[in-house]
Amino acid sequence: MPLSLYPEYYHPVLLCIDDDEDVLECEKTFLEAFGYNVLTASNGGKGLELASTHAVEVVIVDYFMPQMNGEEVALEMRRLRPETFIIMLSGAVDVPEQALHVVDAFVAKSCLATQLLPTIALLRGCACDPPPTYQA
């Protein structure tokens, strides 16, 4: 029986990939406050390595990164784990259209606090009740 049938024991694993360590720490703290298990990687290669060894349900990847950009990471993630949902983030508005076709959703970093949780819930097929208020 899959653990997802026992919600009291199931905490989905999310993987955040961003070259900005401060952003990664904020994402991790925010998502863990809502019960997610969060893995982080500071570049695409490390993220792909983590995804190959963990049952990651959702990948949240920044578009603008050195070495491998978010589109390249998403393409390789699709090959590695086709069942994994991918959300692309960017602080800029000039993400190429073809990059958006590789992912399941896009969230602007300026809307992270209000859009990330509903986007994750929608992709996972969860009831889209408003998330509980975050208490710091």
Question: Where are the language model's segments positioned?
Answer:
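Acidic catalytic/metal-coordinating carboxylates
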Residues: 42-46, 69-73
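Short hydrophobic/Thr-rich beta-strand motif most characteristic of the beta2 strand and flanking loop
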Residues: 35-42, 50
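Non-catalytic signal-transmission and effector/linker regions of two-component phosphorelay proteins
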Residues: 1-13, 112-136
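Active-site beta3 strand of CheY-like receiver
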Residues: 54-60
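Conserved acidic segment of CheY-like receiver
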Residues: 10-22, 27-31, 59
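Receiver (REC) domain active-site loop signature in two-component systems and cognate sites
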Residues: 65
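Conserved phosphotransfer cores of two-component systems
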Residues: 52-54, 76-84, 101
